[in-house]
C-alpha cells in the first residue's frame, strides 16, 4: 500500500478523494486520510532537495535538453516555472539532470542552476538543445563556453507559423519539414533556399526567423545520423511534462511552489524507468571523445573514447518527423 498511494496521487487522484476511493476496496476501517498525502508530499520535497544537491562528478552528460515549463499554483498568483535539464549519458541512457524553480527567459536563473551543477561536478555537455527564447543560452556561454548550441525545431516551427497567415500554414509547414528531415546538411541548406524563395517576398519576417538562426538550427546535422531525431527538438522534455500538466490540471494546480516542484520531480522520476536509450547508444561516447561525423556518418574515429571523469569549464577531448 505504501507504493500504491504515491502512484494513485501522482496519476490524478486528489487527496480529498483518497478515503472514499480506498474504502471501496479496503472497508471503512482502512484508516487512510488526506493527511497521509500531506506526509507524502513533505517526503517528496525532501527527496527533491536531496536530488538537487547530489554529486554529479560520476556521470557524464553528453547531450542536454533544456526548457522552462510553467505550471499553475493554486495559492500563488504567479505560475510556477520549472527550469528542467534532461541529459544523455555517455552510455546513451536518458536521465534527469536538474529541476528547479526559476524564470524561463532569465539568464541569471539559468546561470545559477548551471553554476550549481558545475560546482557539484558536472562536465560541460557537448551539445545543448532548447528554445531560442530561453535565458539558458547566455548562461551556458558563460558557464560552459565550449558547449555547442542547437535550437529546437518544434519551437522554431511554431514561431514561424505565428508570423504567417493561416492560409500559408500547410505549405510553410511542409517546407519547414523538408529542412529538418533532409538527408544531410547540404540538402537541408537547399531546402532553406527553397523556403526563402517561396515565402521571402511576401513574408520576410517569417523567413528571417529561420535564416537568422540557421547555424544553430542545423547544428544537429554534425552528429551521428542515428541521433538526429533526438537532437533537433526538446521532445523528451515536452513528452515527459505532458504527464505533469495532466496531473496538475486534475488537481487545479499544486498548493504551493515547493509542492509543485516536488510533484514534478516525482512524476519525472516515475517516468524515467520507461525512458529508452537514444538510437545507436554506442556512438554517444564517440561524440564525447571528439569523433568527427560527416553527413551523419563517422569520418574520423578518436584514439581515446574514455569519457571525462572530472569537471571542466567546457573543454572537450580531442583525438521523418519532429521528435
Curated annotation (Swiss-Prot):
Record region (Disordered): 300-323
InterPro entries per UniProt: Transposase_mutator (IPR001207)
GO molecular function terms listed in the Swiss-Prot or TrEMBL record: DNA binding; transposase activity
UniProt GO BP: DNA transposition
Protein's UniProt name: Transposase for insertion sequence element IS6120
Similarity section: Belongs to the transposase mutator family.
Entry-linked PROSITE patterns: TRANSPOSASE_MUTATOR
Primary role: Required for the transposition of the insertion element.
Stretches with biased composition (Low complexity): 304-313
UniProt cross-references to Pfam families, sorted A to Z: Transposase_mut
Entry keyword set: DNA recombination, DNA-binding, Transposable element, Transposition
Source organism (scientific name): Mycolicibacterium smegmatis (Mycobacterium smegmatis)
Lineage: Bacteria, Bacillati, Actinomycetota, Actinomycetes, Mycobacteriales
Amino acid at each position: 500500500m505504501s507504493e500504491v498511494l504515491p502512484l494513485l496521487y501522482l496519476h490524478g487522484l486528489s487527496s480529498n478523494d483518497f478515503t472514499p476511493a480506498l474504502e471501496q476496496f479496503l472497508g471503512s476501517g482502512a484508516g487512510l486520510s488526506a493527511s497521509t498525502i500531506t506526509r507524502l508530499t513533505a517526503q517528496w520535497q525532501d527527496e527533491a532537495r536531496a536530488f538537487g544537491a547530489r554529486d554529479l562528478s560520476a556521470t557524464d552528460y553528453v547531450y542536454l535538453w533544456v526548457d522552462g515549463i510553467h505550471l499553475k499554483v493554486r495559492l500563488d498568483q504567479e505560475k510556477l516555472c520549472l527550469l528542467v535539464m534532461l541529459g544523455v549519458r555517455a552510455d546513451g541512457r536518458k536521465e534527469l539532470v536538474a529541476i528547479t524553480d526559476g524564470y524561463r527567459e532569465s539568464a541569471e536563473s539559468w546561470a545559477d542552476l548551471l553554476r550549481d551543477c558545475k560546482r557539484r561536478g558536472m562536465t560541460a555537455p557537448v551539445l545543448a538543445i532548447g528554445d531560442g527564447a530561453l535565458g539558458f543560452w547566455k548562461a551556458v556561454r558563460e558557464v560552459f563556453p565550449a558547449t555547442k548550441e542547437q535550437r529546437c525545431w518544434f519551437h522554431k516551427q511554431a514561431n514561424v507559423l505565428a508570423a504567417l497567415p493561416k492560409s500559408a500554414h500547410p505549405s510553410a509547414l511542409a517546407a519547414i519539414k523538408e529542412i529538418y528531415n533532409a538527408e544531410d546538411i547540404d540538402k537541408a541548406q537547399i531546402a532553406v533556399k527553397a523556403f526563402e524563395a517561396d515565402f521571402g517576398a511576401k513574408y520576410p519576417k517569417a523567413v528571417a526567423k529561420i535564416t537568422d538562426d540557421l547555424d544553430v538550427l542545423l547544428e544537429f546535422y554534425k552528429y551521428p545520423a542515428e541521433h538526429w531525431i533526438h537532437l533537433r527538438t526538446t521532445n523528451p522534455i515536452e513528452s515527459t511534462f505532458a504527464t505533469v500538466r495532466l496531473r496538475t490540471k486534475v488537481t487545479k494546480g499544486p498548493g504551493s511552489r515547493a509542492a509543485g516542484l516536488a510533484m514534478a520531480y516525482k512524476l519525472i522520476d516515475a517516468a524515467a524507468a520507461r525512458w529508452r536509450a537514444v538510437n545507436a547508444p554506442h556512438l554517444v561516447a564517440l561524440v564525447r571523445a571528439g569523433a568527427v561525423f560527416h553527413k551523419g556518418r563517422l569520418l574520423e574515429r578518436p584514439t581515446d573514447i574514455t569519457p571525462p571523469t572530472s569537471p571542466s569549464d567546457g573543454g572537450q577531448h580531442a583525438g521523418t518527423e519532429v521528435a
